[in-house]
From Swiss-Prot:
Coiled-coil stretches noted in the UniProt entry, renumbered to this chain: none
Species of origin: Acidovorax ebreus (strain TPSY)
Protein family according to the UniProt entry: Belongs to the UPF0434 family.
Database matches in Pfam families: Trm112p
GO cellular component terms given for this protein: cytosol
Classification via InterPro entries: Trm112-like
SUPFAM superfamilies for the chain: Trm112p-like
PANTHER family, sorted: PROTEIN PREY, MITOCHONDRIAL, ZGC:162634
Protein's name according to its UniProt entry: UPF0434 protein Dtpsy_1553
Length: 60
């Protein structure tokens, strides 16, 4: 994930920052408690495509 692109992207739900999880290929929104998939290098920032994050995942 290009760091400059990551600086421009925000969570579509909260408009908060996103962090990239390279291992899972996801963009994480801690404020929305959602993980958005990155497919073939393209972020899919759709709420209905995101998965909810557990408390354990948020603590990492």
């Amino acid at each position: 994930m290009d760091p400059k692109l990551l600086e421009l992207l925000v969570c579509p739900v909260t408009k908060g920052p996103l962090t990239y999880d390279r291992e899972r290929q996801e963009l994480i929104s801690r404020s929305a408690r959602l993980a958005y998939p990155v497919r073939d290098g393209i972020p899919v920032l759709l709420e209905n495509e995101a998965r909810p994050l557990s408390d354990e995942e948020l603590e990492q």
